[in-house]
């Protein structure tokens, strides 16, 4: 017979492994600039961050903080970025506002503008003391143009074929600017060569360095180094230098060592195509982006329902869901209104998998913060959005929303049923029904709860507005719970408690 203590240990281990984190992205240097204004003093280093800022994140249910943009940058990228015009995103900007792309990394050491490696250790300790974790960037595709390795070991990079000197594609020394196959080259970075064995080792070691300071890594454009994608993007250059396709994927090669040393590391892949999402998950990523959900949320309730009802628990369990991040426009801008942005945020946060929030999302901001800048255009917080997220974040701390179980509700009825999105979330003794009116029209729908327990009358607790209703169990189970909502309104019902 299994020892009781061992059984409890195994059960807790399974519970911990199944729990999905609530991630909060912060653009580091703009946040320090924001805090300087908030507190009326210079806050430029990580150790200057007032500790109550970490307390605030913890109180609101954040479990992992992605500090975006902490690594050392090159001067080339900064000077390059200062040649651009940012008036469309920041009217009245000055050269002092330009801080350089955080993705033009020269070395995986702390950017001296924000501190030292010891400050990164301090940051992680502050989060750990509050039972939160730290995520940092790993940028596999490219480095700064003036990274030390560009001069010391150019074969680590994709190089121009002999006789090619296109200044839009290659540096003066013949190194390829980084690129995505669908866009023009990024001329502030140069492209690592993943078909060069030595490059693979260098980049595996860089990932190990990131994880020596963090509990997880967000891997920028992780799909670009897949052999199929990389080979197609750089076919001309690879053939010219006689490279052949590696026998395995870089991620498979790197994760063998990474996971042996850091078995609990959370690895998040930025990726967009469905086949790439599934492949990266199979190769060992903990989570992958689900950008398609955001695309659907910008549309109609039919598009959202059609997307989510075909997805499996497994898919929701290994994907990260968001309505904004540093790459995307603000949710309020994309959705067209504060109310639709809140509805979209509710869906993205309650479906399962990694819950992914962005700094400023809770404030209902409309203006995007450009990654090259230390500040965005000034705007006021939306009080209603802030209060709504304060309530939602408390709800999301329930195990039902960080667990794995998800059930789409198919058979709704009522005059506005086609405008409603509904699904069940549960974990152990926690049971919830999420209902969102994803339209501008008020209306009602009957939403069946197939697994509601008991007979007779049952108390159903709507937790967003903290209201209890007494309803007949048989009616709820067979005909549905009647839910009437204003346009873009969400309600979350707790039952079986």
Descriptions of predicted regions:
Residues 17-497:
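Active-site and adjacent substrate-binding regions of carbohydrate-active enzymes
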Residues 1-5:
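Positively charged n-region of N-terminal signal peptides that target proteins for export
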Residues 6-13:
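Sec-dependent N-terminal signal peptides
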């Amino acid at each position: 017979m299994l020892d009781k203590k061992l059984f409890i240990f195994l059960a807790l281990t399974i519970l911990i492994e199944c729990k999905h984190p609530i991630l909060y992205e912060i653009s580091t240097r703009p946040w320090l600039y924001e805090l300087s204004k908030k507190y009326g003093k210079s806050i430029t280093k990580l150790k200057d961050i007032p500790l109550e800022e970490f307390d605030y994140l913890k109180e609101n249910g954040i479990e992992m903080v992605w500090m975006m943009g902490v690594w050392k940058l090159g001067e080339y990228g900064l000077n390059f970025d200062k040649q651009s015009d940012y008036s469309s995103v920041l009217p009245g900007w000055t050269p002092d506002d330009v801080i350089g792309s955080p993705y033009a990394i020269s070395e995986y050491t702390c950017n001296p503008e924000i501190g030292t490696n010891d400050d990164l250790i301090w940051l992680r300790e502050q989060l750990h003391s509050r039972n939160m974790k730290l995520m940092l960037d790993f940028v596999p595709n490219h480095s700064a143009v003036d990274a030390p390795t560009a001069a010391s070991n150019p074969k680590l990079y994709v190089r121009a074929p002999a006789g090619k000197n296109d200044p839009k594609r290659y540096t003066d020394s013949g190194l390829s600017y980084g690129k995505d196959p669908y866009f023009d080259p990024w001329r502030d970075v140069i492209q690592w060569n993943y078909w060069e064995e030595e490059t693979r080792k260098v980049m595996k070691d860089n990932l190990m360095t990131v994880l020596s300071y963090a509990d997880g890594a967000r891997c920028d454009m992780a799909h670009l180094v897949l052999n199929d994608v990389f080979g197609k993007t750089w076919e001309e250059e690879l053939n010219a230098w006689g490279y052949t396709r590696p026998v395995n994927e870089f991620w498979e090669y790197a994760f063998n060592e990474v996971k042996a040393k850091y078995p609990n590391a959370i690895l998040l892949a930025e990726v967009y195509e469905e086949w790439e999402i599934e492949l990266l998950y199979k190769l060992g990523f903990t989570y992958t982006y689900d950008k398609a959900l955001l695309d659907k949320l910008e549309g109609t309730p039919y598009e959202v329902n059609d997307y989510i009802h075909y997805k499996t628990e497994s898919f929701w369990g290994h994907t990260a869901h968001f309505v904004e991040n540093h790459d995307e426009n603000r949710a309020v801008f994309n959705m067209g209104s504060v109310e639709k942005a809140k509805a979209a945020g509710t869906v993205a946060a309650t479906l399962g998998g990694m819950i992914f929030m962005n700094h400023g999302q809770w404030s209902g901001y409309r203006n995007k913060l450009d990654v090259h800048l230390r500040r965005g255009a000034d705007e006021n917080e939306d009080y209603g959005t802030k209060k709504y997220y304060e309530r939602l974040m408390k709800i999301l701390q329930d195990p039902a929303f960080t667990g794995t179980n998800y059930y789409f509700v198919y058979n709704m009825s009522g005059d506005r049923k086609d405008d409603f999105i509904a699904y069940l979330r549960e974990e152990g003794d926690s049971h919830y029904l999420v209902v969102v009116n994803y339209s501008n029209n008020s209306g009602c729908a009957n939403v069946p709860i197939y697994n509601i327990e008991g007979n007779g009358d049952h108390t159903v607790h709507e937790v967003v507005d903290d209201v209890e209703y007494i309803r007949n169990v048989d009616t709820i189970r067979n005909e549905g719970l009647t839910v009437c909502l204003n346009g873009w309104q969400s309600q979350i019902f707790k039952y079986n408690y």
